[in-house]
Amino acid sequence: MAYWLCITNEDNWRVIKEKNIWGVPERHKNTIAKVKKGDKLLIYIKQENVNGEVKPSRIVAVYETASEVYRDSSRIFKSPKGMGNETFPLRIKLKPVKIFDRPIEFKPLIPKLKFITNKRKWSGHLMGKAMREIPEEDYRLILEYAT
């Protein structure tokens, strides 16, 4: 089993929660191809301005993958600014494990997370990625903050 941090925004988090589907752009096909049924996915919402309020980067849920990767270009996800008509066609069906009552703010976790080796420029570990594998130790640490 592998553990993944899946990077999204507020709009597409609503889609994930409603439809139990994770999707990535074609350019991330090599990454999503490594995901197997039964893997655990943490949903990370990047910092953004929502209705004039700056919401910090946070982890909102954990899911288990319930399918292999499949292709579907139907428009269910919202294309973020600068991504044109992106449909996130490489998808995986999900099964919710836990949707956190209170999101876990990400910045306080940074000093403790093993996968973030550059603590000062930590966003570089996530920038330009749709998802990234994380060590089981980091996954367990994040879950501790959810309780």
Curated annotation (Swiss-Prot):
CDD domains: EVE-like. InterPro entries: EVE_domain (IPR002740), PUA-like_sf (IPR015947), UPF0310 (IPR022996). Pfam families: EVE. It comes from the Archaea. Belongs to the UPF0310 family. HAMAP family: UPF0310. This is UPF0310 protein AF_2356. It comes from Archaeoglobus fulgidus (strain ATCC 49558 / DSM 4304 / JCM 9628 / NBRC 100126 / VC-16).
